[in-house]
A protein has these predicted regions:
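A short, Trp-centered hydrophobic/proline-enriched beta-strand micro-motif
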Residues: 29-36, 88-90, 194-196, 224-230
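An anion-binding catalytic pocket shared by soluble metabolic enzymes
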Residues: 43-50, 84, 103-106, 115, ...
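Short, solvent-exposed aromatic-acidic interface loops
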Residues: 127-135, 258-263, 399-402
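A glycine-rich phosphate-binding loop feature that marks nucleotide/adenosyl-phosphate handling sites
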Residues: 200-203, 231-237, 287-288, 304-312, ...
């Protein structure tokens, strides 16, 4: 992969209110989709006006550049005179560098759309973007007018990048899973690890279009962030994640710990299970401790609550912080990624264990996905997700291993987590 080293040019933007159907057609290929119904937010990004990619060593500098406060010149007046669009940079950060199976997805990639359509606070807006050096008010106004005409007059959907369907799943072997769990427990008993999150894959033959899958997920999981990132060549990375990595506005940060899982019918039992409470406490302590190094203040509730989803329940603790004046998104990502909810405790030892023994090309799974813009970001941990390409949807399923875990119970937990996408595939 070639890393972009050129400075990121300032952007020019133009926005307006709009109307039309929820999923309009005629706007070109949909490159990114983001829906969080609980917050009333829905985003669709079309085309690319600008893209930047980086290797792991360039992540901090890239995030700092994307989130700088003066990154956009609005040609229709001051930014505070209108609702600000999410982002507008959209993209993802891989858990580990994607290999051949992830062709079309760079390890770190963010892009500005040519056209952004978003619903929020009960209203719809549209914005167009271009590098400032290439933009004029007339050219952006023409693009904006054309987009508004398409929004007003066309119906249908534009998320038909790759087909998916439910069928008999091809899964990683249970014997290999059991061996990996046993090895993890050996390292835990030797005190090398306290927790490690191991993952496996499930392959499902392709069938219905991705748009139907996304629409089912956002209806079934309004508390989650349903996402779609189009890869080069038409591959798709889709999911509906329950875990926010960060919501950043200026220096105010909101994040969360999500660890400990059960069937919805057993949700309240999570508050009485020592194994799940212990696992959750380690995640909370790690996140809060990492944030204290870059924050003026960190607020953590005294005890967790339960978050119930349609197919699974989790222990949940919201965490908020006010960053030091010199800290921003780059420092937050450096401090928290990967969290113990997807790596383990201690973090470095857990990630090393996974690299040596998991033998799974995680790619974007368990990485970060979302939107970045001037002095703000909305990023989630990419969970409950699948890579869709070549007629196959590969689902990624993980479970946290701690003292007291068993291979059988953790396998069943991953089966439980698979239901979100499998049910959506069947409904689609």
């Amino acid at each position: 992969m070639t890393q972009d080293t050129a400075p990121i040019p300032r952007l020019a933007g133009l926005s307006a209110e709009a109307s039309g159907p929820p999923d309009p057609s005629g706007l070109g290929p949909l490159c990114f989709f983001w829906s969080h119904p609980e917050r009333g937010l829905r985003v669709r990004a079309y085309g690319e006006a600008l893209r930047r990619e980086a290797g792991a060593g360039g992540l901090g500098a890239l995030l700092s550049a994307l989130s700088r406060a003066d990154g956009i010149t609005w040609l229709d007046g001051p930014a505070d005179a209108r609702p600000r669009p999410p982002g507008p940079w959209f993209g993802a950060v891989a858990f580990d560098p994607p290999r051949a199976a992830w062709s079309g997805f760079a390890p770190i990639r963010f892009a500005v759309p040519r056209l952004l359509v978003w619903d929020g606070a009960g209203r719809r807006h549209v914005a167009v973007f271009a590098p400032e050096k290439d933009a004029t008010r007339a050219s952006l106004q023409s693009a904006l007018d054309e987009a508004r005409r398409s929004l007003d007059g066309r119906f249908g959907d534009t998320i038909r990048n790759s087909p998916v369907a439910r069928a008999a799943a091809v899964q990683d072997g249970r014997a290999r899973w059991a061996g990996l769990v046993d090895l993890a427990l050996e390292r835990i008993r030797s005190s090398e690890l306290r927790k490690v999150v191991i993952a496996r894959a499930m392959d499902v033959p392709a069938g219905p279009p991705v748009d139907a899958l996304l629409q089912h997920l956002e209806r079934a999981y309004p508390q989650c962030r349903t996402f779609h990132l189009r890869g080069d060549g038409g591959a798709a990375f889709v999911g509906s994640t329950p875990e926010s990595f960060c919501s950043l506005e200026g220096r105010q940060l909101h994040t969360e710990a999500l660890a400990g899982s059960a069937l919805p019918a057993e949700a309240q039992e999570l508050l009485r299970r020592p194994k799940d409470l212990r696992e959750h406490e380690w995640v909370v302590d790690h996140i809060a401790g990492a944030l204290r190094d870059i924050s003026e203040s960190v607020e953590v509730p005294a005890s967790p609550a339960v978050r119930e989803l349609a197919t699974v329940a989790h222990l949940h603790t919201p965490i908020s912080a006010r960053l030091h004046s010199g800290a921003g998104l780059a420092e937050v990502v450096a401090a928290l990624h990967p969290t113990p909810a997807v790596g383990g405790v201690p973090s470095a030892a857990a990630v090393r264990f996974l690299g040596e023994h998991e033998k799974l090309d995680r790619g974007l799974y368990a990485g970060l996905i979302g939107l970045v813009g001037p002095s703000r970001a909305e990023l989630a941990v990419a969970l409950r997700c699948a890579r869709i390409a070549g007629g196959t949807a590969r689902l990624f399923l993980g479970a946290g291993i701690v003292e007291g875990s068993s291979a059988e119970s953790e396998w069943m937990e991953t089966q439980l987590k698979a239901r979100a996408l499998l049910d959506a595939l069947e409904a689609a």
